[in-house]
Amino acid sequence: RNVKTKNRCEFNNAADQKNEQKVKVLDLCTGSGCIGISVKKLCQNTEITLADISEGALSVAKKNAENLNASVTLIRGNLFENIEGRFDYILSNPPYIPSQVIQGLMPEVKDHEPRLALDGEEDGLAFYRKIIEQAPDYLNSNGRIYFEIGAEQGEDMIRLMTDRGFSEVKVHKDLAGLDRIATGIYSRR
């Protein structure tokens, strides 16, 4: 099973366990909203919040949600800025490309994606560090976090998440066999 199929089953199972309550999902650094909107379309018993610092990205996400008839909440802010409450899941595809690598990217990436969406600062991990540090304040007990990561960031993500107290930290490979998704669970102590 690939990660998308596994996650669809997981969101539906989480919804079943919450009975009539909606599963609360935060898509942080949402960009076009494709991750959060896809979750909403696959599992209707979710309450999806899409958050991004870019007004332009949120405009695209809003259009995508409208075109797909997906009911979502949009919030503009820098990471957790303006986010209230706790979530069952935090999903994030933050900028993760090291600054010095961006110039060497394929033209279809570097010339068509805003630098804001790509630049993960010096080592590509800056946004992960910030999100991992703050995420426990926004996760329900046993809340889960999912990150899209760069192909060579798996070991660093395991260390960062484990050091912050996440359990069951795993890195999942994509169809090419490269590290692509890092996941973990945060339990209240």
What are these regions (language model features)?
Residues 122-186:
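Conserved Class I SAM-dependent methyltransferase catalytic core
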Residues 1-92, 97-103:
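Conserved SAM/SAH cofactor-binding pocket of Class I
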